[in-house]
UniProtKB/Swiss-Prot annotation:
Annotated protein name in UniProt: Nuclear egress protein 1
Subunit and interaction comment: Forms a heterohexameric complex with NEC2. Interacts with capsid vertex specific component 2/CVC2; this interaction directs the capsid to the host inner nuclear membrane to initiate budding.
Region (Disordered): 1-22
Keywords: Host membrane, Host nucleus, Membrane, Metal-binding, Phosphoprotein, Zinc, Zinc-finger
Chain's gene name: NEC1
Length: 264
């Protein structure tokens, strides 16, 4: 009887050991990963070069919370949950968890921006800095009615970051926009970038540096001709014809317009 019990215990113990070996717990997995040596990774990357780039992209932000970026920088290359920071010393993506600037920042949603677009005819003075960027060019105004994305991006940025200046232009019979951030030191919150990306389907949106300013450029690549979004463009044009552009704004427009020729 005793022998039988001992055999049962031993077989049960072997069974449990077998299960543990087949399914290592979290601590064992972690221990296994820590045993990987640099030459092991090097051997893997030699066989699969594409994994090296993925590995580097994964580890950069968690280690320092920051990753350097090159300009021009397309928002299509933006890492989720990171802010963008520009200065004369460095241009970086910063992990939201490591960001010290965004706690009190309120960013409009893409839906807020669309509502504002639909109401822009009745809120011309409220949105006057947007309309200054058209320099009373009625053809550009007409084009803007078919491209709500332009207004939405301006609205999101303008309500998040102060001291910006839009300049509208035509490229390939589509409306484009430069937003000039009038400082070389700039922090763009993660949520602001997220909302811009949410509305910019069919557009190329990128950041660059011109002299002492950071420039956000919006270029339309694919125009949505099936949009059901309409505004009273005739009434809008009439109001803009009557709107005065301050001399200071006109001078600034001419200054930036000269610098931005050929920039896009």
């Amino acid at each position: 009887m005793t022998v039988h019990k001992n055999r049962f215990r031993r077989s049960r113990s072997l069974s449990v050991t077998h299960r543990i070996q087949k399914r290592p717990d979290h601590r064992e997995k972690t221990k296994l990963y820590l045993q990987l040596k640099l030459h092991d990774l090097h051997a893997v990357f030699n066989l699969f070069p594409e994994y090296e780039q993925k590995f580097l992209a994964i580890i950069k932000l968690p280690i320092t919370g920051k990753e350097p970026i090159d300009v021009p920088f397309s928002l299509s290359n933006h890492h989720q949950h990171t802010c963008l920071e520009f200065s004369p010393y460095a241009n970086e993506q910063i992990s939201k968890s490591a960001c010290l600037h965004c706690e009190s920042v309120s960013v409009p949603t893409s839906s807020d921006a669309m509502v504002a677009h639909l109401n822009q005819v009745t809120n011309v003075m409220q949105n006057r800095f947007y309309f200054y960027g058209f320099r009373k060019d009625m053809e550009l105004i007409r084009m803007s009615a078919k491209q709500p994305t332009i207004f939405q991006i301006f609205y999101i940025v303008h309500n998040t970051i102060n001291n910006i200046f839009p300049i509208m232009f035509e490229k390939k019979q589509k409306l484009g926009m430069h937003i000039v951030f009038q400082s070389r030191t700039l922090h763009i919150p993660c949520e602001c970038i997220k909302q811009i990306i949410a509305v910019s389907s069919g557009y190329n949106v990128y950041l660059d540096i011109l002299q002492d300013s950071v420039i956000l450029t919006v270029l339309c690549e694919t125009l949505d001709t099936n949009t059901n979004i309409h505004i009273d463009i005739g009434m809008l044009q009439k109001k803009l014809e009557e709107m005065d552009i301050p001399n200071e704004i006109s001078d600034r427009l001419e200054k930036y317009k000269g610098h931005l020729i050929g920039f896009h």
